[in-house]
């Protein structure tokens, strides 16, 4: 069994009978949308249409997908029709992300052990000196140091704590929806993807000068809860002006045409040289809003159920002062990202809270913990330059374990299928919390950590005895002694497993 049919066999355990309820004419919950693409134009189209998607890059080998399809049909890749090509790639991207989320959901579902919750604010007074900001502009995003506070704690089974959250990938009857897209440009009967190099872009732009071509975009929308799939293609005809050699060279110098299908954009530098279009403008940018809406409705979901951005939010950048350091230009904004004014007197990242994975490696003979995965935080981040564990904001619709697993993969390549969750610690501040998820590599499995995004300077296995020698994130410095004791105790508890 393979391809999209495989989804249904692996989706049966996901489906539950609960449904969303209406309040007046609107749903009371937003259904999350996951975009299987790192394309900024596609993200922007959705964002300005009121949808902030979770971004999950598929890492699909596009050449291999097309080569395999051509071989199955006994033809060459060039003989595959353009609508078939874009549809195959859109399906492959959606399916790859679906499988990645299945792995996250499975590991979270199999999580065991105890959830220990600390309530530090119950042990301090509102006028505690530690609540005041230190005068440094960076202090507002620096975690308070509770190392000298006797923190009240509660303990409950981890799965019981997750059930109490009332959210998660397997907790909904609908969604999240996963959208895969792929675009190609057809000129003189030949399909073109991204040129990647200036030389290829130059040759293509010269052929496009004064010509007419077609932009095709495949869309595959998949409902994670039910495994249902809807798919379709959009097409638009474009008429180009004459391009001078000067224009071509200057356009290539912008870098814009190198990483877009057909070597041009409607919403960028190239837009002024498109003299006319017939068809859907958003499809030319890489995601047809009308088609995406139609596919959503085919799955029985209202398009407006995906709205999770207010009109004002579409034009506001929420960025507290961090000593003048700003995130990279291409940094991705996800649903759940944002600063919370916490009761502790500081700002914390994650409107749904935040979570990370404390992954430990054990000696194969003794079972003792030898290393943990650590993240050297990017300079632009809160407390940049310090060491902690990979993690971040919990996205809409995720529970804490799922959020930690997704974030740790995105940041550090901690693959969920290779680890087992054995407990957690939640520091609860009331309106915000951070959950540290304790995990071991599965027996016979290895995790190969690396920096997957711009939020880390480096990711590495660090010997457990050397952790205190690093410049640690405030919360990590405070919690590490108890975390180390718990990791060692968990290793004894799970010895031989």
What does each model-found stretch correspond to?
Residues 30-33, 72-315:
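Anionic-ligand binding patches
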Residues 11, 23-25, 147:
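Serine residues within intrinsically disordered or low-complexity segments
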Residues 53-62:
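A short beta-strand-loop structural module common to alpha/beta enzyme folds
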Residues 239-241, 448-489:
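NUDIX/MutT-family hydrolases
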Residues 132-133, 313-386, 392-445, 489-497:
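N-terminal leader/linker segments that precede catalytic domains of diphosphate-processing enzymes
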Residues 30-51:
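N-terminal beta1-alpha1 ligand-phosphate binding loop
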């Amino acid at each position: 069994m393979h391809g999209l049919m495989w989804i249904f066999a692996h989706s049966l355990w996901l489906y539950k009978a609960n449904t969303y309820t209406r309040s007046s004419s609107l749903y009371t919950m937003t259904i999350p949308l996951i975009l299987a693409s790192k394309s900024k134009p596609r993200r922007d189209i959705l964002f300005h249409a009121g949808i902030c998607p979770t971004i999950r890059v598929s890492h699909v080998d596009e050449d291999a997908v097309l080569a395999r399809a051509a071989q199955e049909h006994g033809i060459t890749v060039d003989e595959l029709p353009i609508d078939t090509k874009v549809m195959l790639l859109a399906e492959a991207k959606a399916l790859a992300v679906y499988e990645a989320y299945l792995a996250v959901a499975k590991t979270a579902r199999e999580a065991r052990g105890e959830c220990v919750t600390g309530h530090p604010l119950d042990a301090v007074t509102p006028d505690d000196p530690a609540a005041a900001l230190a005068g440094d502009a960076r202090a507002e995003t620096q975690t308070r140091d509770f190392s000298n506070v006797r923190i009240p704690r509660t303990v409950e089974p981890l799965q019981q704590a997750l059930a109490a959250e009332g959210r998660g990938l397997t907790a909904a009857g609908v969604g999240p929806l996963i959208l895969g897209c792929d675009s190609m440009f057809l000129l003189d009967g030949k399909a073109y993807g991204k040129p990647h190099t200036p030389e290829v872009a130059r040759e293509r732009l010269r052929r496009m000068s004064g010509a007419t071509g077609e932009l095709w975009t495949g869309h595959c929308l998949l409902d994670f809860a039910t495994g249902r799939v809807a798919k379709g293609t959009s097409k638009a005809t474009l008429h180009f002006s004459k391009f001078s050699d000067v224009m071509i060279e200057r356009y290539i110098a912008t870098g814009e045409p190198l990483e877009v299908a057909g070597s041009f954009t409607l919403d960028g530098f190239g837009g002024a040289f498109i003299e006319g279009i017939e068809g859907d403008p958003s499809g030319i940018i890489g995601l047809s809003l009308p088609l995406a809406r139609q596919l959503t409705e085919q799955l029985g979901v209202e398009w407006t159920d995906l709205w999770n951005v207010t009109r004002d939010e579409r034009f506001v950048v929420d960025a507290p002062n961090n000593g003048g350091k700003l995130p990279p230009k291409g940094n991705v904004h996800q649903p759940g990202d944002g600063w919370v004014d916490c009761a502790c007197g500081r700002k914390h990242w994650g409107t749904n809270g935040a979570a990370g994975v404390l992954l430990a490696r054990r000696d194969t003979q003794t079972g003792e913990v030898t290393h943990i995965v650590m993240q050297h935080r990017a300079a632009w981040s809160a407390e940049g330059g310090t060491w902690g564990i990979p993690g971040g904001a919990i996205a809409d619709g995720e529970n804490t374990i799922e959020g930690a697993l997704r974030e740790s993969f995105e940041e550090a390549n901690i693959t969920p299928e290779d680890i087992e969750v054995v407990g957690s610690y939640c520091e609860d501040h009331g309106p915000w919390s951070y959950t540290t998820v304790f995990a071991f590599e599965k027996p016979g499995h290895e995790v190969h950590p690396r920096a997957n995004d711009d939020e880390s300077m480096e990711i590495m296995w660090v010997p457990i005895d050397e952790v205190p020698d690093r410049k640690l994130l405030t919360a990590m410095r405070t919690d590490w002694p108890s975390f180390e004791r718990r990791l060692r105790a968990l290793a004894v508890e799970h010895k031989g497993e």
